[in-house]
Amino acid sequence: MPVTGRRVVSMGVILGFVLSVICAPPPAAAAQGGVVHTSTPRIIIDTDLSLWWDDATAIGMANVLAQRGQLHILGIVSDIRNPHAVAAIDAIDTAYGHPNIPLGAVAHSEANTAPHGYTSDLIHKLPHSVHSSENVSGAVVLYRQLLAGQPDHSVTIVAIGAYTNLAGLLRSKADRHSSLDGRALIRAKVKRLVIEDGLFPGSAPALTNQKLDLVSAREVISGAGWPTPIAWVDGSTGLQTKVGGALCTTVRSTNPMRIVYESRFGCGPPGDGDWDGPTLLYAVGGSQQFFTELGQGGAAFLNAAGGLSWSTDPSRPHDVYVHVANQPALNERIDALLGAR
């Protein structure tokens, strides 16, 4: 049966058609209130939010920037096999006043093989209308629906997790949302793919995001690969991005960033860096003072160990990898966004 919007429609053909119109994801402007200007970054976040706290920070920061009209969240797709991850994402979005952001779940998320981490805390402490992956569209279906409705070359995909949904989008066929196959749809609608991964320019072993789905990683990175420019915000960006230390004393107990921080670190100093927050900031632009772009004329490739390396590649002239240029300023900016409501 058709899957549209944030709900799975499972009734008859006629009723299903009616509901597909009524329950379709709200237009981009309606989801966050207001007209989307052509200059406003339009993003789709692809996340493995479940255990690592920095996925939550990226989504929280995106919501704050959306409140300020500095970006527009078209949708968020989960790429982790935790059926309740989308409920936690919905809890974050709802806490920031954006309960209607379209959500999608990776195929077979009901397998429930991923640790739940702090997702249970968010679900138990904050209101939300999505309860599991059964309540939302499939990630690839939602990708296609969202991309089809956007102007050409206007969407930035912020990939801060596994490659499963990206590979699925590449493989996807024409459907009722678009007559284009996945590769052609990406080429038409996506401006750039921003990925948190790698340790460039040297060679690295397989890191978390590759290990989650190495087959899909190869599909996105190798061979014909991804048909738009890719910016890689590599692992070095997060090592010294120690943020969130003041949340327990500066924001209310219902602040979703505080809930995540307390769950992971118990109000002590951050026990981990933050990789996904910098990736989100870089992806939406206007933060050149924090980052430097390197590696022009090259591209990432998967080495024999399943990790990423950088090499000259004339076929991908617009790919870059990104390092931090001003760590204190970056940390200050992220802390300010984490503490905002």
Language-model features: where?
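N-terminal acidic, glycine/proline-rich low-complexity segments
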Residues: 32-341
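Secretory targeting and sorting signals
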Residues: 1-31
